A protein has these predicted regions:
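His/acidic metal-ligating clusters that form di-metal
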Residues: 79-86, 161-220
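Sec-dependent bacterial lipoprotein signal peptides
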Residues: 1-18
Length: 220
C-alpha cells in the first residue's frame, strides 16, 4: 500500500515536471520575449546617421493595433523608399495592452530597414500595457535630435492616468526647454492624443500649447 502511494506521488511529480513547459501564462503577465529597450538603441542610430544632415525625412505611422497585415504592408512600403531616415510610430500598437500584441507589432516593425521609435498610445496604457511598453520600447516621455531638428515625444493620454500623474508631464517639457540643443533650429512635438481630442485633458490645452510654442523661441 505504501509502495502504491509512493508510486502515485512520484508519477504525479514526473507528470508535473514534464508539463511545466506547457504552462500558458496570463495574457497580462508581462513576461517579454525578444528585444527590449528599443527606443534608446534606435535613437542612438538615428542621431548618428542624421548628425551631419540639414534635412531629415521620416515616416509617421500610428494606430496599427490589430492590423499586422497592414503593418507589414506599411513596412514594405517604407522599405521601398531610399529617402526615409527613420520611422516615428505615434502609438496604439496594442488594442488591449496585451504583451503579445506589443511583441507582434515589435517583430513586424523590426523588419524596417532603418531605425524606428515608438510613442505610447491610449490603448497601450490598458491593463499592464504601460509596463510592457516601457520594457520593450522605453520611457513614455523622451526626446532626441536628428540633424538640426529636436523631436520631443510626449505621453498625452491623460484619460488613462489618475490625477496623481502629470499628463502631459510639464516638468519634462520644462527640462527639455532648458537643455534645448544649440544646433537645433526646428522642433517636432510628437504625441498620440493632440489637444482637443477626447483623450487629452483639455482643461490644460492653452497652457500646453503655450509651453510648446516656447520651443520655437528657443530655436529662433
Amino acid at each position: 500500500m505504501r509502495f502504491e502511494k509512493l508510486f502515485t506521488v512520484v508519477s504525479f511529480s514526473i507528470f508535473f515536471l514534464t508539463a511545466c513547459n506547457k504552462i500558458e501564462y496570463h495574457p497580462y503577465d508581462g513576461r517579454i520575449n525578444g528585444k527590449t529597450g528599443i527606443n534608446k538603441k534606435n535613437i542612438a542610430l538615428i542621431e548618428k546617421a542624421c548628425a551631419a544632415k540639414d534635412t531629415v525625412r521620416f515616416a509617421v505611422i500610428s494606430d496599427t493595433q490589430g492590423w499586422l497585415d497592414e503593418t507589414a504592408r506599411i513596412v514594405k512600403s517604407i522599405n521601398s523608399r531610399q529617402d526615409v531616415d527613420f520611422t516615428l510610430h505615434l502609438g496604439d500598437l496594442s488594442d488591449f495592452g496585451l504583451t503579445k500584441e506589443f511583441e507582434w507589432q515589435r517583430d513586424c516593425l523590426e523588419k524596417l530597414a532603418r531605425p524606428y521609435v515608438c510613442l505610447i498610445g491610449n490603448h497601450d496604457c490598458l491593463a499592464t500595457g504601460e509596463y510592457v511598453f516601457k520594457k520593450i520600447f522605453g520611457d513614455i516621455n523622451f526626446a532626441f535630435t536628428a540633424g538640426k531638428t529636436r523631436f520631443v515625444c510626449l505621453n498625452t493620454n491623460s484619460r488613462e492616468f489618475d490625477h496623481t500623474t502629470s499628463v502631459p508631464d510639464f516638468s519634462f517639457i520644462k527640462e527639455q526647454q532648458e537643455i534645448f540643443p544649440a544646433e537645433a533650429v526646428n522642433t517636432v512635438a510628437a504625441m498620440h492624443a493632440p489637444p482637443t481630442s477626447e483623450q487629452f485633458d483639455n482643461n490644460i490645452s492653452p497652457y500646453f500649447e503655450y509651453e510648446l510654442l516656447s520651443f520655437l523661441k528657443r530655436a529662433a
